[in-house]
Amino acid sequence: EIPEQPNVEDKHLAVEQDNRNLINESFRVLRTNVDFILGNDSKKVVMVTSMNQGSGKSFISANLASCVALRDKKVVVLDLDLRRATLSKIADSPKLGLADYFNGKVKNWKEIVTRSEDNENLDVLPVGTMPPNPTELLLNKTYLPDMIAELRNEYDYIFIDCPPVDIVADAGIVSKYADMTLFVIRAGLMEKSLLH
């Protein structure tokens, strides 16, 4: 359980190297649980999604990725919520990003990698230009699978921030490339009976 953090700006990470407050310790516990579930080194792609908007999945994606990177692991987080680009704010929302790579405007994904200002081991692949056709871009048979395969060779961990599963098909498309799916559920936003 990650406690609510009302005073954190959208673009800043709450996780800090030497901070032992409740939110930092909660992310360390989550990091340990994710490592336990993933098991071996070949499994490293974690998709983060939710059932509905406003659950805090982008906050969880960014801070969990940052927490893992604090262990001197090379980590990348992909903003594949191509409709909202919330996670891209930690990279100051560059003009070029994944949408531009998927539609062929950018030839190599390495051109759009943005280093986090808060953590030198954390890279971000932002959305870039907001596309009119996000689902169609993700359905492309080469860009996403080829990029994920290359990222597996470059990074120790890959976190993918996806839109909520109950709203659009995007998370279902991306899930086949993930080794693990982490569902974020915000207290008071979803009825407990829907979790079964």
Each model region followed by its residue ranges:
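Short, glycine-rich, amphipathic interfacial segments at transmembrane boundaries or analogous
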Residues: 1-15
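P-loop NTP-binding module
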Residues: 4-6, 19-196
